[in-house]
């Protein structure tokens, strides 16, 4: 085992240990997704959990025992694992630090290798190579997540992936998500599918009147002040670029 954990543990130290150790144990089968992908792409957005997709598996029960076994390698770790219908949730507490690991499974997922780079160095450890969900697939899922939840956090993540990471959404993945919408919002929960054309209208309407004050009220706890300044117009420009791509296929 080459993954190291300094004690007393810190939250970022736990994140890094999980990323490095999972890469050692599960190799290309453990794929990081969600907010930690943005963190590895140098996003300043804070995150309190780390999301994984394990491939190629058909059931979370196939991985739960191995995940717990790996986490118990940490001396005196407090581990709580729950299996939900849509995910496996593992709480990990070491010393005074705690993180949450959320995982689900899939038979396939487009991935790319990524160095833990600056994040690892910020914790005082050398970089290692991990697997992350392809940024284009991540962007497609983030657009779909915004559509179902309407959170400004998701809109920021779309902006970051498109403008700062240079990703274009995987339209096949997005179309699959739009074809089986699952929203709990009152105005959307009865809607089970959406066209790209309507999604574009919803995105443009949401960003047309977006202000820095709106973003600050929701994102001040997870973004530094220098990232919030002028963010509304940056998101608006990015969303306009995304919608142009979404409308590129005239059949949708």
Feature roles, as predicted:
Residues 1-31, 38-50, 54-252:
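Structured mid-to-C-terminal alpha-helical surface segments
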């Amino acid at each position: 085992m080459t993954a190291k954990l300094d004690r007393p543990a810190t939250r970022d130290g736990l994140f890094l240990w999980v990323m490095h150790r999972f890469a050692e144990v599960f190799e290309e089968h453990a794929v990081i997704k969600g907010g930690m992908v943005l963190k590895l792409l140098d996003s300043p957005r804070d995150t309190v959990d780390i999301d994984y997709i394990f491939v190629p598996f058909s059931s979370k029960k196939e991985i739960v025992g191995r995940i717990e076994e790996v986490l118990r390698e940490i001396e005196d770790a407090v581990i709580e694992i729950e299996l939900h219908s849509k995910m496996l949730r593992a709480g990990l507490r070491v010393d005074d630090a705690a993180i949450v690991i959320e995982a689900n499974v899939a038979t396939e997922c487009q991935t790319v290798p990524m160095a833990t780079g600056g994040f690892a160095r910020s914790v005082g450890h050398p970089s290692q190579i991990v697997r992350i969900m392809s940024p284009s697939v991540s962007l497609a899922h983030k657009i779909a997540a915004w559509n179902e939840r309407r959170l400004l956090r998701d809109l920021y993540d779309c902006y970051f992936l498109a403008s700062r990471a240079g990703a274009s959404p995987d339209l096949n993945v997005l179309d699959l998500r739009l074809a089986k919408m699952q929203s709990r919002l009152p105005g959307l929960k009865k809607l089970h599918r959406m066209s790209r054309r309507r999604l574009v209208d919803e995105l443009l309407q949401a960003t047309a009147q977006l202000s820095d004050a709106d973003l600050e009220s929701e994102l001040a706890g997870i973004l530094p002040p220098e990232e919030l300044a002028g963010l509304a117009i940056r998101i608006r420009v990015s969303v306009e670029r995304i919608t142009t791509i979404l409308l590129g296929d005239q059949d949708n």
